[in-house]
């Protein structure tokens, strides 16, 4: 049986599978996709802690449900940074960063 990490968020508890990152570090696989109860509760709690904002920004794809729910609850819009440039982007802004869960660098792109 896989080792787990117990997560307590927004009054809810989840058991997360621990995934070996390297010989010195594990990460807990926290996948909110499909967990509507946790997404709604976490969005509400995060909004209580957020300073005033005009827009939410999330990375494609796992952050989308949380950003969507935070947008729904707050009435503020959200934008998804895509993993690559798209044909419809007229003035893309590109950043690259090293991801701990994806081998190599990860590109994130938004249109101005």
Protein language model features and the residues they cover:
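Short, flexible loop segments at the rims of nucleotide/cofactor-binding pockets, characterized by
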Residues: 32-38, 57, 100-102
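Short glycine-rich phosphate-binding loop at a beta-alpha junction
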Residues: 53-60
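Short, glycine/charge-rich flexible loops or terminal/linker lids adjacent to PRPP-binding catalytic cores
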Residues: 76-112
């Amino acid at each position: 049986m896989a080792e787990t990490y117990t997560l307590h968020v927004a009054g809810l508890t989840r058991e997360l599978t621990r995934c070996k990152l390297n010989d010195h570090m594990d990460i807990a696989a926290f996948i909110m996709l499909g967990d509507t109860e946790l997404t709604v509760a976490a969005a509400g709690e995060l909004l209580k802690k957020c300073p005033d904002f005009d827009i939410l920004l999330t990375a494609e794809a796992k952050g989308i449900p949380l950003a969507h729910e935070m947008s729904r609850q707050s009435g503020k819009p959200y934008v998804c940074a895509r993993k690559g440039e798209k044909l419809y982007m007229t003035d893309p802004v590109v950043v690259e960063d090293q991801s701990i869960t994806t081998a190599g660098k990860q590109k994130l792109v938004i249109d101005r």
